[in-house]
Amino acid sequence: TSRRQRQMCIRDRHGIRDVNGDPLNWEACITMNNNWGYCARDKFFKPSSMIIKKLVECVSKGGNMLLNVGPDAYGNIPPESLQILSEIGAWMKKNSKSVYGCGMAGIEKPDYGRVTRNGNLLYYHMFENTMGPVPLTGIKPGTIKKIRLLCDGSEVPISDSWVHTDYPDIVFANLGPDPVLPDAVDTVLEVELTE
């Protein structure tokens, strides 16, 4: 609240902005466990799935993520950290295109995950599966050139099921009958727009 106008409350729901209302660069700094640097007693490491989802969240909000890795006095990185970094690296090997060079998509966050964007490419990050076809909210029908799974490049068809006729303004991607996502941490759909 303001000192002069106690009834006034200032909120930052629209992100961090400068005096002109333009978004500012920002960064989230996180640790792999609960301490900065090395702490032999701290064995409470964050799972790689949590770190991947936080990375995607930062990018989808227009930010950067710094990940702290604390080597010991001899320069050795703890085995727990190496395992987590290896798992993050395996996910990035398949999905880095949805992170590097991307930023906010200007689309409301879907219930199942996040959305990042790079030019005419939208990346729908699915942290959990939907019941049936995936609603690609924020995209106008007729503006999609192609949808594919980023992890393997396989094309994903647009659903034309009769159950979607009540939602003419939403495009639905059909991942098929298997309710299990290809990647339990974050399955990424790359949506190429015509413009």
Language-model segments: which ranges?
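Single conserved hydrophobic/aromatic residue that forms the stacking wall/gate
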Residues: 1-10
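Carbohydrate-binding surfaces of carbohydrate-active enzymes
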Residues: 11-195
